[in-house]
Amino acid sequence: MSGQGKRLMVMAGGTGGHVFPGLAVAHHLMAQGWQVRWLGTADRMEADLVPKHGIEIDFIRISGLRGKGIKALIAAPLRIFNAWRQARAIMKAYKPDVVLGMGGYVSGPGGLAAWSLGIPVVLHEQNGIAGLTNKWLAKIATKVMQAFPGAFPNAEVVGNPVRTDVLALSLPQQRLAGREGPVRVLVVGGSQGARILNQTMPQVAAKLGDSVTIWHQSGKGSQQSVEQAYAEAGQPQHKVTEFIDDMAAAYAWADVVVCRSGALTVSEIAAAGLPALFVPFQHKDRQQYWNALPLEKAGAAKIIEQPQLSVDAVANTLAGWSRETLLTMAERARAASIPDATERVANEVSRVARA
């Protein structure tokens, strides 16, 4: 499907959970001849990341309102109006055929600016419960898509766009069949690390002994303290790294993952075909719980919420999963994934642009 001469503006910012899926869709459409620009904020990760991917970025000034106090709330209408005006000027100059909102605060004024100019708005909600910005924008959007069922009552479920190297992994029955020895446990707390996992997993390792081998991503600045915790637990043999640059290789190595349940993490684990023990971040919307729930319902994962998290709870769960059980869970995870999510989102953008 050629997009020769068509123009897209992607609105996404703040976190990797918004930016990476946007980049996947952008690259897919650029390969079809689309021109793509990005709308973001200068002080968040998209400012550095997006230009590295060969995409020009325009900035507006906007930030979140939650927990900012009464003065910020009083000033909010003026700040939103100014951001809307900036976004409107950018879009009048660029003249996109369609804008794609992938979440983050930038999508709010950006979506309103597009709507006020008669430019169709396409939305993608990555989480199992809709963010505030997308809830507002859904009322004016031409098309609303969601990664997990339930964020919007009638939106099409298309999954989350996932990195191509994760999608390229061999199927779990090819990867995991015939594996022997200690169960390989990959521990991932997100790029910031998760203090609760850093504190809990060394003690879990002590309980499970040589039945497991662990690769633990500690997050920035925590590697030394986590290595020390494993050593003090009598388990110095496990591997601790601040970051894992090649997540596809880590997924290929693992038999099971212990992690938070950010939207992109859940989608990647399903696409990789891996069983998981999810410890959702305690957010007032329980966003990460709802992200993980479809995989638990599919028999591919278990959720332990943070108040119930203990060394025994994690150790007993991992000890109770035989290799046969892990393979069955891995196959269920893969079956629950939507590997063509990028194409599905891109096709809707193309369809709306042609309408």
From Swiss-Prot:
Compartments in which it is found: Cell inner membrane
Pathway: Cell wall biogenesis; peptidoglycan biosynthesis
Protein residues bound to UDP-N-acetyl-alpha-D-glucosamine: 15-17, 127, 163, 191, 244, 263-268, 288
A Pfam family matched in the record: Glyco_transf_28
HAMAP family on file: MurG
Function: Cell wall formation. Catalyzes the transfer of a GlcNAc subunit on undecaprenyl-pyrophosphoryl-MurNAc-pentapeptide (lipid intermediate I) to form undecaprenyl-pyrophosphoryl-MurNAc-(pentapeptide)GlcNAc (lipid intermediate II).
Stated family: Belongs to the glycosyltransferase 28 family. MurG subfamily.
Protein's UniProt name: UDP-N-acetylglucosamine--N-acetylmuramyl-(pentapeptide) pyrophosphoryl-undecaprenol N-acetylglucosamine transferase
Annotated organism of origin: Escherichia coli O9:H4 (strain HS)
Gene that produces this protein: murG
